[in-house]
Amino acid sequence: VKRRIDQLLVERGLAESRHRAQALVLAGQVLADERKVEKPGQQVDAGAVVRILGLLPFVSRAGAKLEGALRHFGIAVEGRVAADLGASTGGFTDCLLQNGALRVFAFDVGRGQMAWKLRSDPRVVVRDRFNVRNLGPGDLPGDVGFVCMDLSFISVTKILPVLGAALDSAGPPSEPEAAAVRVVDVVVLVKPQFEAGRGEVGKGGIVRDPAVRVRALGAVVDCAAAAGYGVIGDMVS
């Protein structure tokens, strides 16, 4: 009898959810009968010996990407209130908490995707079924000092101006002890497949042409500058 490896990991208690199981597989950390599993949907023997080479530091690989950005740009989130747009499983949120964020407002258009350990954490305010295109006055507290964004199936150029306006019209502070906010740091994960034209995206949603990727990033930078953001730089995630 064969089983999907992601299902098997959950059934055996090696992963708390299929999202977590898939992240472990994609990180190359799952072995079935001492052979590395390449795909989350890979079929393996139901009785296979399955082991994990090492635990991921965050609930998804996205956390490692944000960690890299924080280090690269020298951004400290300790003691700050943050907003995670497109939170999904919670990789970014997990990274923020592990780096000392005081509170995280986690927005996602879906429902119930966030890992339970984060959903049940009192420092996390879950805003499910929230399309961030509709961010408005009062949706963000006045003490938000950091925003991260990991969105799919929409261009971030549609969100950056909306986010800027929401920050300008933010509500009252959520934490009395949070540091006074003068500058808000924003980290955006740019996905070229959602920024490029339809004819520029290949099979599987992959943009292989370096020129298209550069142009997509440039469009995001131009949008950010036009919306009043100060663009510090970029990096490969």
Segment roles from a protein language model:
Residues 14, 71-78, 138-141:
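Glycine-rich helix-loop-beta junction characteristic of Rossmann-like nucleotide cofactor-binding loops
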Residues 1-46:
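A basic, amphipathic helix-loop patch mediating RNA/tRNA/ribosome contacts
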Residues 157-186:
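A short glycine-rich, Lys/Arg-flanked "PGG" loop and its adjoining helix->strand segment in the class I
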Residues 192-209:
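Short, glycine-/aromatic-enriched active-site segment of Class I SAM-dependent methyltransferases
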Residues 213-227:
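Short alpha-helix
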Residues 89-100:
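Conserved SAM-binding loop of SAM-dependent methyltransferases across substrates and taxa
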Residues 78-88:
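Conserved class I S-adenosyl-L-methionine
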Residues 105-154, 158:
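S-adenosyl-L-methionine
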